[in-house]
Amino acid sequence: MKLLITGGHLAPALALIEEIEKTKKNIDIVFVGRKYPIDREKTLSLEYKEINKKNLTFVSLEAGRLTRVISVSSLIGIFKIPIGFLKAFFVVNKYRPSHIMSFGGYLALPIVFWGYIFKIPVFTHEQTIKPGLANKLISFFSKKIFVSFDEVKNNFPANKTYVSGNPVKPSIFKIWKKPFEIKKDRPVIYITGGSLGSHSINMHIKKIIVSLLHRYIVIHQTGDTKEYHDFEDLLNIKNQLPKELQSRYFLVKHFFDDQIGYIYS
């Protein structure tokens, strides 16, 4: 059996892979994702690093998408939509998976479309409370749709939608590696915008980090998007703080699977 996994939500995808590796030894997994998080950058994406650590097949795919904001980059994205569909055809045709599991997003849409055309069973998972346009389109081609929350069901056809919850990696309940040592003498706040980070969250934290550090230990996962230089800007802010406050501020670009358990411990 060959399973092709694709989509924008990395954490539940990794949780599924971890469960498959533990219980199903005869499944060949192919992961279709972005090698670089943003087209203009050459920083390797977290999904590429994680999948390669697991020695699984990683196929890089670039695809365009529709956005609500009109700009030069959004227009380029529109022109890349047919190119993405063409590339996705060759991916699906080459690997011919027996099943496709989508975790949503613009990258998954062309893969799911061709899976449907090739009569490959497609399944999708919606992680968030408000489905995006891509997942609404993907739902049409899907045999079954899994959602994290009961209130999301109304966004999809009732006859093939199931509340599964959000897949969670068992690794977060175990301490495999300590990325740093925390002296837990006060409450801990973990700030994250997901694998890519969140520029808007990072911008807000820049304004309030000093006041937070007077009362809390802060673990801040910024992401590694070179377009905004958030990690570098926040590192500069940290270096200008008094030593006592610096010792309470743990700044990282991202955490790997074997590190996240310590954060939640």
Task: State where each predicted segment sits.
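Short amphipathic alpha-helix
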Residues: 10-22
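Donor-nucleotide binding loops and adjacent catalytic segments primarily
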Residues: 37-42, 177, 182-265
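Conserved nucleotide-sugar phosphate-binding/catalytic loop shared by glycosyltransferases and other
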Residues: 5, 26-76
